[in-house]
Amino acid sequence: MAYLKNNFNGNVANPKTLVKIVNKKSKIVINYKAYNSCLFSYSSKNNSELWRGCVCEFFLDLGDDFYYEFEVAPNGATFVAKIKNRVVTFFEQDFFSGSARIEKDNYFVEMVIDLDKIGYNPKYIKYNCFRVEYKPNEKEQNLSALNPTLCGTFHVRDKFLTL
């Protein structure tokens, strides 16, 4: 388990987010504990702009010319897309499940990715974990990352970690 850091400077993030990643038998299981959230979910519709609210995100690079982006909002809405040259392509899939549970001002997310259904090279799996905390009345999003990109976007592939 590890705490996410402030995405801009790498310091301790506030609010705190604890993440645990387990790679077992071709499934990646990611659990987030997102503390002290305003719990603002931008939409209840899957594959909408969930990042405009509070959300936990997981980026997965399997060595292709694209990478996957997975998101789960506090209300359980999910986002699954391929990102290639900063272009988002949504698609129907059966290899991802995401869920969220709220307790007071915290929410807990579980993501499960079945790598066998995607097709992958077990020697090349890269990833990064993120959280967006966004209060609708504030202009700035609070961005945190397992491996901070040190800028205003999470889409920095060379900051992905090896699993």
Task: Kindly give the residue locations of the regions a language model identified.
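Structural preference for beta-rich elements and adjacent junctions enriched in aromatics
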Residues: 1-163
